């Protein structure tokens, strides 16, 4: 799921001997999240990392402080790479079934706000595959990269009999 890649990325960097400052925490635990982000912001007042890698939540940022953190890191001149996988909200046919219109409107607005921040502050936005980049072709990111899923590749081909599949993992 959505926790596999961050776990593997973190372990790979640590195993390569890098010092990694980790920010983790759930968006829906507002006070805890804000405290953890403030701790990183304070750390950044005394430290400048070489790079910043971001795995956004599966959904929009609910805490404005996360976008403020991206802005601070960007303004420090630290290159930011962000992995974007949760664009299911762009598929109205599946994403919003049973969701009240008022809630759809608010969440879509928050997703668009996040995309604008990613476009402005991130040096490269990574997607799981080249095919995924087509979903957001209208957003002109500075650079796009491909970062395959953090899983073991299956041996042999995978055959599916379905004509249409929509999978929103996590």
Spans of model-derived segments:
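N-terminal subdomain of nucleotide-sugar transferases
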Residues: 1-27, 47
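Conserved donor-binding/catalytic core segment of Leloir-type glycosyltransferases
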Residues: 155-170
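Active-site proximal beta-strand in glycosyltransferases
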Residues: 51-52, 71-94, 99-105
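Glycine-rich, highly charged phosphate/nucleotide-binding loops
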Residues: 29-47
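Short N-terminal targeting/anchoring amphipathic segment
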Residues: 42-66, 77-83, 124
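Short beta-strand->alpha-helix junction loop in the catalytic core
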Residues: 131-132, 146-156
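Membrane-proximal helix-turn-helix segments that form the acceptor-binding/catalytic region
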Residues: 71, 75, 103-124
């Amino acid at each position: 799921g959505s926790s596999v890649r961050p776990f593997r990325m973190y372990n790979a960097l640590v195993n390569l001997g890098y010092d990694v400052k980790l920010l983790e925490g759930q968006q829906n635990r507002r006070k805890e999240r804000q405290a953890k982000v403030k701790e990183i912001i304070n750390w950044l007042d005394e430290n400048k990392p070489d790079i910043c890698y971001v795995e956004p939540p599966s959904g929009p940022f609910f805490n404005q402080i996360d976008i403020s953190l991206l802005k601070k890191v960007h303004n420090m001149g630290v290159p930011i790479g962000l992995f974007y996988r949760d664009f299911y909200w762009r598929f109205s046919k599946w994403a919003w079934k049973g969701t009240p219109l008022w809630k759809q409107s608010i969440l879509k607005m928050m997703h668009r706000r996040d995309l604008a921040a990613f476009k402005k502050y991130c040096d490269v936005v990574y997607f799981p595959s080249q095919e995924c980049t087509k979903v957001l072709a209208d957003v002109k990111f500075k650079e796009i990269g491909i970062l395959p899923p953090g899983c073991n590749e299956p041996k042999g081909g995978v055959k599916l009999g379905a004509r249409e599949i929509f999978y929103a993992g996590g």
